[in-house]
Amino acid sequence: MDKFYNYNSSSNQALLNLKVKPDSKQNLISDFVIINNLPYLKLFIKTAPEQGKANEEIINYLAKAWKLSRSNIEIIKGHTHSLKTILIKNIDEDYLNSIINSYIK
């Protein structure tokens, strides 16, 4: 699989799938896994999935790890599920590629 995300160059936005494991020992971005022929970035989050706290931690952690504003990361699908889709706004595709390539093993 050669594309791990969907990028819209006219709006500088990307969609990225996440496989989230809440209630983990540490916050950690792992690698990609294929689920139903789609790539998902594995993400371990310390926070338990209670009252949206894990979703908030996902946004905080990714924003810090990727040096993005929290307002540029939005969960658009899977709010109550471990499989999520995030929208990343105002991101250059070259920068996104550098982020993604660091997790491909």
UniProtKB/Swiss-Prot annotation:
It holds the Pfam family DUF167. It comes from the Bacteria. SUPFAM superfamilies: YggU-like. Signal peptide: none annotated. GO terms for cellular component: cytoplasm. PANTHER family: UPF0235 PROTEIN C15ORF40 (PTHR13420:SF7). Belongs to the UPF0235 family. This is UPF0235 protein A1E_05380. It comes from Rickettsia canadensis (strain McKiel). The lineage of its organism: Bacteria, Pseudomonadati, Pseudomonadota, Alphaproteobacteria, Rickettsiales.
